[in-house]
């Protein structure tokens, strides 16, 4: 009997959401994504000890550079066990500074280049702020492809598509968390607000022939994944990938091109900020996500600083 994982792979590219290359080798995804929180967890894995030590060599006390070198080193290890691409994230503390995002993205690409890894195997992850989206628009024109993350609203998705970014990562589980806490409801199936958000974005992109890839992210359970079967890509934690592999039930495709979607929405900065302000969930979860990534970035830098 075919597993749900194999059925899912027939119409969705499966991506591993982890920095643990041993787990990635075990679940065999096409691509992989990392973020500051996952890199912090990876730093505690004994197999990464030498990568941490190597990252601080010749950094001249620049802990930010050491952090970027560690992220790239982890990316290199992951690329040895996947056929596709690695997403490496720009420091979340730069999320509201377009020029700083550009500089850090260029440095990450330069580090990968020095390591012999081509641009065609890397996506630069950037928070979906107005400044981040504008930076991504410039990077795309330079031939550096991007993954816009911490995406919680339709306004963010519309702005990303308009900017021509390569890929977006709309979050499912964190949206579910917010509504469950706010309303006390334990949403299931197609009633899940996170599932509804990604479904709306997917249909909008396909109806308007946007080429931007939709990669659902942040899953709390198998039901959320199953409800988005057919999405371009889904980035899933290794434990949920293994649960899909162990389940031999039938998996029905839920998303496919051809469904009705809303007309194109082109937003200027003022309109983007107003729509974002009107969406309490998206405003709160974006701010919370940036703060959490920033705190974990600081913890990672503290580990590296101790080795400088």
UniProtKB/Swiss-Prot annotation:
Coiled coil: none
Keyword check for Cytoplasm: yes
Organism: Pseudomonas fluorescens (strain Pf0-1)
Any GO BP: pentose-phosphate shunt
GO terms, molecular function: transaldolase activity
Pathway the protein takes part in: Carbohydrate degradation; pentose phosphate pathway; D-glyceraldehyde 3-phosphate and beta-D-fructose 6-phosphate from D-ribose 5-phosphate and D-xylulose 5-phosphate (non-oxidative stage): step 2/3
EC number: 2.2.1.2
Primary location: cytoplasm
Name under which the protein is recorded: Transaldolase
Cellular component GO terms held in the UniProt record: cytosol
Keyword Cytoplasm: yes
Family annotation (CDD domains): Transaldolase_TalAB (cd00957)
Subunit structure and binding partners: Homodimer.
Transmembrane segments: none
HAMAP family attached to this UniProt entry: Transaldolase_1
Gene (name only): tal
NCBIfam families: PRK12346.1, talAB
Function: Transaldolase is important for the balance of metabolites in the pentose-phosphate pathway.
């Amino acid at each position: 009997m075919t597993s749900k994982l194999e059925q899912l792979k027939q119409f969705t590219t499966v991506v591993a959401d982890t920095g643990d290359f041993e787990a990635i080798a075990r679940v065999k995804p096409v691509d992989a994504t990392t973020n500051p929180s996952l890199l912090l967890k990876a730093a505690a894995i004994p197999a990464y000890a030498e990568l941490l030590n190597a990252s601080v060599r010749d950094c001249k006390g620049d802990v930010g550079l050491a952090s970027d070198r560690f992220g790239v080193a982890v990316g290199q290890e992951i690329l040895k066990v996947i056929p596709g691409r690695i997403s490496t994230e720009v420091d979340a503390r730069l999320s509201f500074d377009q020029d700083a995002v550009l500089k850090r993205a260029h440095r990450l690409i330069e580090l990968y280049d020095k390591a012999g890894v081509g641009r065609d195997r890397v996506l630069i992850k950037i928070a979906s702020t107005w400044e981040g989206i504008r930076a991504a628009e410039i990077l795309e024109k330079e031939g550096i492809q991007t993954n816009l993350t911490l995406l919680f609203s339709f306004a963010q998705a519309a702005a990303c598509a308009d900017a021509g970014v390569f890929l977006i990562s709309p979050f499912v589980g964190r949206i579910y968390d917010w509504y469950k806490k706010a309303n006390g409801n334990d949403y299931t199936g197609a009633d899940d607000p996170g599932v509804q958000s990604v479904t709306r974005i997917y249909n909008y992109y396909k109806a308007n022939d946007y080429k931007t890839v939709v990669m659902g992210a942040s899953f709390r359970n198998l039901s959320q994944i199953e409800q988005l079967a057919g999405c371009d890509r889904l980035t899933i934690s290794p434990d949920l990938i293994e649960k899909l592999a162990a389940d031999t039930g039938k998996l029905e495709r839920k998303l496919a091109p051809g469904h009705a979607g809303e007309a194109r929405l082109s937003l200027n900065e003022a309109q983007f900020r107003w729509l974002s302000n009107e969406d309490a969930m998206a405003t709160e979860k974006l701010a919370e996500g940036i703060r959490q990534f920033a705190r974990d970035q600081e913890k990672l830098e503290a580990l590296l600083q101790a080795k400088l």
